[in-house]
Regions:
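Structural recognition of the conserved hydrophobic beta-strand(s) that form the central parallel beta-sheet
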Residues: 245-247, 272, 285-292
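Substrate-engagement module of ASCE P-loop NTPases
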Residues: 233-235, 265-285
Length: 404
């Protein structure tokens, strides 16, 4: 802590080293603080004296923890939120709860909602899909929010109504039925041999067999029969139709796309696993499949001819990613914080974000869609850089380049 002076013009702060290095943590006059446009979300604790607090309240409106007692503005008469005197000229303000939390790397809807993270409401799309369709396929690039959307559907069909309070889906759905949900994340099955892939699928089925039981007469590697029995047993036990969510269905095949000898047997394993879906129609409430490739390109769902591909439908162009109106209206506060950190206007921040991250169009005359991973990282770090490419080499593009 800095030692306060008797003057009324000083603010004393401790914060991260990014804006003020440790050697410069000292008395900061109003001129310095506003020249550098320090945002109060960057402040962990503040020691403020006298009239300067009133000026800050008028300037920022963020000091809701302190109130002057009896209309006096002298530091010795400040009291904290519970009405107790601070007995001195150093009232302490905890600003940690003011900082926005960004869901970097978090792909679970429940964790984002319960953790109070920044969230752009996509639940209206979820409720609409659940109402209009039974079998849905969505193709989007990597790091584009497919897994979060899948998780949101999982919570929706699990009847977790409390997670959707205040969100669009709560206005559209009055019947929160709890369905048995089978959620398969195939991103965990990358870079595997045929035997490893079968075992990986088997482990995923083990999880649901712990809840709904297994049939010892079915061979462990007969994943087709195990999936079929699981769905039928879940419907029998719960009395409600089942939901199947397959996230990144094509992940096991991406690294063998240019090797036909390896691709064919791996594709056959996946085709065999997914094949019961069509015959299970009487037992299914909803099926949702995501991937990078169109399902027709890999011929895995050739038997599932009732799959609705919404990937290039205009009304779902913003189902993943962030649209321009969402950025300007729902992410207004993060944009403002970034502008203050970079010492530029909000319009300039929007211009830079647009130039770097909104190059996606998923149908004719599509609105501009921002890559959510890059955009959220930029708002969190308050800087412009190539976040998407830094996460790893885009394998499929690399393979295409090699094959050419």
């Amino acid at each position: 802590w800095s030692t306060p002076s008797r003057g009324l013009e000083n603010i004393f702060i401790t914060r991260s080293d990014t804006l003020f290095p440790r050697r410069n943590r000292s008395t900061i006059t109003p001129t310095r603080i506003f020249t550098r446009r320090l945002h109060l979300a960057d402040v962990r604790f503040a020691c403020i004296s006298g009239d300067f607090l009133l000026y800050l309240e008028a300037r920022f409106g963020r000091f809701d923890k302190l109130r002057p007692e009896g209309g006096s503005a002298t530091g010795s008469e400040f009291c904290n939120q519970d009405g107790k005197r601070t007995n001195g000229v150093i009232p302490i303000i905890d600003m940690a709860e003011k900082a926005l939390k960004y869901p970097i790397g978090i792909q679970t809807f429940k964790d984002i909602v319960e953790g109070g993270y920044v969230y752009v409401d996509k639940t209206g799309f979820v409720a609409e899909l659940a109402d209009k369709y039974r079998y849905v396929f969505l193709s989007r690039p990597r790091r584009f929010g497919k897994s979060l959307l899948s998780s949101t559907l999982h919570s929706y069909f699990s009847g977790e109504e409390e997670l959707f309070r205040g969100l669009k889906a709560s206005e559209m759905n009055s019947d929160w039925m709890r369905h048995p949900v089978f959620h398969f994340d195939m991103s965990t099955a990358k870079h595997m041999t045929e035997l490893q892939l079968i075992r990986n699928i088997g482990y995923k089925l083990d999880f649901y067999e712990e809840e709904y039981g297994n049939d010892t007469r079915i061979a462990r590697d007969d994943v087709n029969a195990r999936l079929e029995r699981l769905i039928m047993e879940a419907v029998r036990k719960t009395g409600e139709k089942a939901v199947i969510i397959i996230d990144e269905y094509d992940a096991p095949l991406l690294d063998v796309m240019n090797d036909r000898e390896k691709l064919l047997p791996m594709r056959q394993i996946m085709r065999n696993f997914y094949s019961p879906i069509k015959s299970l129609d009487p037992y299914l409430r909803f099926v949702f499949i995501t991937g990078i490739n169109k399902f027709a390109q890999l011929s895995i769902f050739s038997e599932l001819n009732n799959l609705k591909n919404i990937s290039m439908m205009p009304e779902y162009s913003a189902i993943c990613g962030i649209s321009q109106p969402e950025l300007e209206n729902r992410l207004k506060e993060p944009v403002q914080e970034m502008a203050e950190r970079l010492l530029v206007s909000c319009d300039e921040v929007l211009r830079q974000l647009k130039r770097n991250y909104d190059g996606y169009h998923f149908c004719a005359n599509s609105e501009d869609i921002y890559n959510p991973y890059s955009l959220i990282n930029a708002l969190s770090d308050k800087e412009i850089k190539n976040f998407w490419f830094d996460t790893g080499t885009p394998t499929y593009l690399s393979l295409i380049h090699i094959s050419e």
